[in-house]
C-alpha cells in the first residue's frame, strides 16, 4: 500500500502567477525601513564576503526566489540572500540592521501569511541550509534551519526514528517548530517544541548563541512557540523516538450525508483513543482518489485520516469501529512506510494555488459546531476548499501552559478552515466563505489559536495566539530584539 500515490490522479491546474492586491501585512516597527536603492558599494561589500547567492531584481533566479507556497503573496524584496552557512546569516542580519532594511526569513516558504518574503527589504533564504546529522544511540538529530519535514524524516527514518512534525512534507522545519508544531505523532510524543533540545540562533545584534534549558534559557523558552520574533535559528537539535519505519495508516471516506453522525462518533472515539492512535477528520469535495469510485469524485465527503504507531495487528482491532461509522465510499488503510504517509497529502497542498485560512482551537466538539460545519460544507466555494479537525490531546496537554511559549495545552482539536482556489476572480468568494464559517464556529471554540495558522489580516488575534505568555514574551523580545528587527512574523512588540 503506497500512500505516496493516493492522490496520483489529482489534477489541480495551477496557472501562471496572477496576483490581485495582496492581503495587508501586519508588520510593525519603531522605525521606518528604507526603500530606496542600496548604494552599489554596500552591495559589492556584501557580495565579497557572502558565500551564498545575492539576488537582485532582474537577476535570472530572482522571480522564482521571491515566490512562496501561497500564490496570494506577491512581494518584491530589494534583495534575496541565499545563505549557505551561519556566517552568511550573520552578514545578512548585520546588513539589514545597519541599513534599516525590512527583514524577512524564509525557511520552507510555507507561511500562510506570507511572512517569508517582504517588499523592498531583504529576504534571508535558508533553503540551502538543510544538512542533518543523526546520533541513533543518543536518539538526537541536528538539522539546519532551511530543512523541510521531508529532509528531517529522511534522515531520521534511516534509523527508524522520528520526532513529531506536521503533515505536509514540504513545510519548513523552522517555521513549524517556532510556532509549536503538531502532527501524526503529537498525541504520543507531544508538540514539535516539546522535543526541541537546543537551537543555534543569530540574534538581532548579529551574535550567534546556543539556546537550551541552561544556556539562554529565556530565549529557549521563547523560541518554543514564539514564532520568528527572536532571531534566525540556523540549527535545531531534536529528541527522537522509535517510529516505524512501517506503520498502519490510511483513509476511510464517508459520504457527506453521514457527516454529523460520523463527527459525533469520531468525538466519542477520540475521547477513549490511546495516545498511539491519531485520527483527523476532513470535510471537502472528494478528489479523484484511485480507491474511490469515479461516480463519487467531486461529491461531498468526510474523511478520517489515521496513523497508529504500535503493533499493526492491534491497530487493526483499534480502528475497526472507524470502519463502521456508516457505509464508507472507500477505504485505503494498511501498513506502509511512515515517510510515505508523511507525504500522502503533498499533492493536495502543492504550491501555486491561492490559500486563505481561519482557525480555532477546541477543548470539546459540540453538536452545534457540527451543524455549522455541515451548513458551510454545503457552500464550498471551490473543489479544493476544506475544513479539517486535527486531533491533538494526549502528550500535547501534559506540559504546563507556561512551560514553553506555546500556551494552549487545553486544546484537544485544532480546526482549520482552508480556503484554496486557483482563479484570482474567486478571491472574495473563497475568503468570504472562510471568514463566515469562522464566525459561525466561534461560539464553540476554546479561545486560543495556533499561531502558524494566522492569516495576514489577523493582527487582532496575536495576543490570543500567545495567550497568557504574551507579557513574558514581550520582555524576552526587549532583551534580544529591542528595535523589533524581526517583525515579519506574528509580531510581539518589545515590552
Which residues make up each language-model segment?
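Short linear/disordered segments characteristic of secreted peptide precursors
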Residues: 13-15
Amino acid at each position: 500500500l503506497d500512500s505516496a500515490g493516493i492522490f496520483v490522479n489529482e489534477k489541480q491546474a495551477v496557472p501562471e502567477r496572477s496576483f490581485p492586491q495582496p492581503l495587508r501585512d501586519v508588520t510593525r516597527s519603531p522605525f521606518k525601513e528604507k526603500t530606496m536603492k542600496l548604494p552599489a558599494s554596500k552591495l559589492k561589500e556584501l557580495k565579497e564576503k557572502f558565500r551564498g547567492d545575492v539576488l537582485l531584481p532582474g537577476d535570472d533566479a530572482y522571480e522564482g526566489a521571491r515566490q512562496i507556497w501561497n500564490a496570494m503573496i506577491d512581494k518584491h524584496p530589494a534583495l534575496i540572500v541565499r545563505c549557505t552557512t551561519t556566517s552568511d546569516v550573520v552578514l545578512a542580519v548585520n546588513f539589514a540592521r545597519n541599513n534599516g532594511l525590512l527583514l524577512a526569513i524564509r525557511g520552507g516558504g510555507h507561511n500562510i501569511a506570507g511572512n517569508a518574503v517582504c517588499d523592498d527589504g531583504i529576504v534571508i533564504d535558508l533553503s540551502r541550509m538543510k544538512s542533518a546529522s543523526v546520533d541513533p544511540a543518543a536518539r538526537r538529530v541536528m538539522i539546519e534551519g532551511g530543512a523541510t519535514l521531508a529532509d528531517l524524516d529522511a534522515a531520521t527514518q534511516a534509523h527508524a526514528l522520528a520526532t513529531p512534525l506536521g503533515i505536509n512534507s514540504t513545510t519548513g522545519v523552522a517555521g513549524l517548530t517556532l510556532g509549536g508544531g503538531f502532527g501524526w505523532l503529537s498525541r504520543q510524543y507531544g508538540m514539535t517544541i516539546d522535543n526541541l533540545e537546543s537551537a543555534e540562533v543569530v540574534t538581532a545584534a548579529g551574535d550567534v548563541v546556543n539556546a537550551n534549558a541552561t544556556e539562554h534559557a529565556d530565549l529557549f523558552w521563547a523560541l518554543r512557540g514564539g514564532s520568528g520574533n527572536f532571531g534566525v535559528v540556523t540549527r535545531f537539535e531534536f529528541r527522537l523516538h522509535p517510529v516505524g519505519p512501517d506503520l498502519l495508516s490510511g483513509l476511510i471516506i464517508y459520504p457527506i450525508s453521514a457527516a454529523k453522525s460520523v463527527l459525533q462518533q469520531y468525538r466519542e472515539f477520540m475521547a477513549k483513543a490511546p495516545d498511539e492512535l491519531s485520527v483527523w477528520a476532513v470535510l471537502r469535495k472528494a478528489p479523484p482518489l484511485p480507491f474511490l469510485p469515479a461516480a463519487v469524485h467531486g461529491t461531498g465527503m468526510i474523511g478520517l485520516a489515521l496513523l497508529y504507531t504500535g503493533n499493526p495487528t492491534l491497530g487493526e482491532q483499534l480502528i475497526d469501529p472507524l470502519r463502521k461509522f456508516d457505509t464508507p465510499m472507500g477505504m485505503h488503510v494498511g501498513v506502509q512506510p511512515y515517510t510515505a504517509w508523511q507525504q500522502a497529502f503533498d499533492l493536495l497542498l502543492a504550491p501555486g494555488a491561492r490559500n486563505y485560512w481561519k482557525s480555532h482551537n477546541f477543548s470539546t466538539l459540540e453538536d452545534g459546531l457540527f451543524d455549522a460545519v455541515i451548513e458551510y460544507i454545503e457552500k464550498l466555494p471551490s473543489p479544493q476548499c476544506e475544513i479539517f479537525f486535527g486531533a491533538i490531546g494526549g502528550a500535547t496537554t501534559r506540559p504546563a501552559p507556561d512551560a514553553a511559549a506555546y500556551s494552549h495545552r487545553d486544546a484537544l482539536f485544532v480546526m482549520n478552515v482552508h480556503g484554496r482556489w486557483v482563479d484570482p476572480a474567486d478571491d472574495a468568494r473563497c475568503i468570504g466563505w472562510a471568514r463566515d464559517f469562522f464566525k459561525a464556529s466561534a461560539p464553540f471554540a476554546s479561545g486560543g489559536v495556533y499561531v502558524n495558522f494566522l492569516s495576514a489580516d489577523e493582527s487582532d488575534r496575536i495576543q490570543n495566539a500567545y495567550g497568557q505568555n504574551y507579557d513574558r514574551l514581550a520582555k524576552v523580545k526587549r532583551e534580544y530584539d529591542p528595535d523589533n528587527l524581526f517583525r515579519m512574523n506574528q509580531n510581539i512588540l518589545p515590552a
